[in-house]
């Protein structure tokens, strides 16, 4: 079976969708649409796709199996609804699902009524150490998670130069809440499932960029009592484009994940596991992760920060898992979307251990949480989700 695909929006990510999906033998990119015709020709001609400047006739003429929506953050609703109206059975959407809850609800409602399926590309679920984090928390290897932090920051070049002369207009329609915290919120919902965010308190500021907030800094409370701080800014003068780190504190262990390292940091991942685990159980979990394509080292060692003070190491050895500089896979989630369509399931064989793939329901939940973050920052109060 060969799946017919149409791609709407050919900016930075839209172009990548075309080349990545066209590289799969089960996929044929039959149409591409962008308001800039020259760009559509540049992207579409090399893969033999028909070029359009209007996605409505493209969807009607091509009748694709999959429509990819890679338009700017606030412009997802209309192409998604058009794809559903044209009878497209599967829609791959870039995150965030929407910048308003009303848009997300409208898309999900239309999909459910039509029997269409929406997939939302939360790419930060796909890399090996993303999946290792999910494994450790879902298997209770840290005990109950009680607190955590996520810092996801961009260089100031992103809101000032990334999209060329269109940058300001693009950024005015989004923010670090939608552009960055959509990643953080979804990642936390995924690893903490089935727990859900129930309330939010947030702040923001506009001191550097006047046309969009400089940052959002929020506290999320989950229904199991866990609390997380999530912070995202895009006014940093850093060496790289992105810095991304996550911390999880459990009742029995802790996890640190430097996904995209900053100055004087190393990209890596360490989980100090519950003291109840012995070395046999440690090796079992290491083997299970290896079988899933996640290479982590196993340590069974004394960890006592007071050893130099009291001149002795207390307690029994501690089980830990760690990894450094593991290659990322930013397209694993999208590839699993294709597998899901082929296998007609939300849990295809390529995503067997990580729960259902992110769908329109996840998109709505993420949009609700981010919407609460924005509302809380504007009103200066706790907002229930």
Predicted regions and their residues:
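N-terminal Rossmann-like dinucleotide-binding module
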Residues: 1-47
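Beta-loop-alpha module in the N-terminal Rossmann-like domain of NAD(P)-dependent dehydrogenases
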Residues: 17, 50-110
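Aromatic/hydrophobic pocket-lining residues that form π-stacking "cages" and hydrophobic walls in ligand
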Residues: 40, 79, 107, 133, ...
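Hydrophobic residues in well-ordered beta-strands that form the structural core
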Residues: 53, 69, 92-93, 118-120, ...
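C-terminal helix-rich "cap/oligomerization" subdomain common to oxidoreductases
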Residues: 66-68, 310-385
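Rossmann-fold dehydrogenase core element
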Residues: 104-124, 144-148
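Predominantly a Rossmann-like dinucleotide-binding segment in NAD(P)-dependent oxidoreductases
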Residues: 124-210, 227, 236, 380
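Contiguous beta-strand/loop segments that form the cofactor/metal-binding neighborhood of enzyme cores
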Residues: 179, 183-280, 285-295, 302, ...
């Amino acid at each position: 079976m060969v799946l017919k695909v149409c791609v709407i929006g050919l900016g930075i990510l839209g172009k990548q969708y075309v080349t990545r999906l066209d590289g799969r033998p089960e996929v044929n990119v039959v149409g591409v649409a962008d308001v800039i015709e020259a760009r559509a020709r540049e992207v579409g001609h090399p893969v033999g796709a028909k070029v359009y400047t209007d996605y409505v006739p493209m969807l009607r003429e091509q009748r694709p199996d999959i429509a990819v929506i890679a338009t700017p953050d606030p412009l997802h609703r209309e192409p998604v609804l058009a794809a559903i109206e044209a009878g497209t059975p599967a829609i791959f959407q870039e995150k965030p699902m929407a910048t308003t809850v009303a848009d997300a609800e409208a898309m999900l409602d239309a999909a459910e009524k039509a029997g269409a399926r929406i997939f939302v590309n939360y790419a930060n679920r796909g890399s090996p150490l993303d999946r290792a984090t999910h494994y450790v928390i879902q298997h209770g290897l840290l005990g109950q998670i009680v607190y955590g932090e996520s810092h996801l920051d961009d260089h100031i070049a992103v809101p000032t130069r990334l999209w060329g002369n269109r940058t300001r207009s693009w950024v005015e329609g989004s923010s670090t809440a939608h552009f960055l915290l959509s990643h953080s919120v979804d990642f936390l919902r995924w690893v903490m499932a089935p727990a859900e965010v129930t309330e939010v308190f947030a702040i923001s500021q506009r001191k550097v960029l006047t046309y969009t907030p400089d940052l959002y800094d929020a506290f999320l409370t989950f229904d199991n009592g866990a609390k997380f701080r999530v912070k995202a800014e895009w006014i940093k003068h850093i060496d790289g484009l992105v810095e991304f780190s996550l911390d999880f504190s459990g009742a029995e262990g802790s996890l640190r994940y430097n996904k995209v390292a900053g100055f004087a940091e190393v990209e890596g991942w360490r989980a100090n596991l519950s003291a109840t685990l012995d070395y046999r159980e440690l090796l079992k979990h290491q083997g299970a992760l290896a079988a899933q394509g996640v290479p982590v080292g196993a340590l069974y060692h004394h960890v006592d920060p007071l050893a130099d003070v009291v001149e002795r190491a207390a307690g029994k050895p501690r089980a830990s898992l760690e990894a450094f500089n593991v290659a990322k896979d930013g397209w694993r989630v999208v590839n699993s979307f294709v597998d899901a369509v082929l296998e007609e399931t939300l849990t295809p064989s390529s995503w067997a251990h990580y729960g259902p793939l992110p769908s329109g329901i996840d998109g709505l939940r993420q949009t609700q949480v981010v919407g609460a973050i924005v509302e809380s920052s504007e009103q200066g109060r706790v907002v229930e989700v």
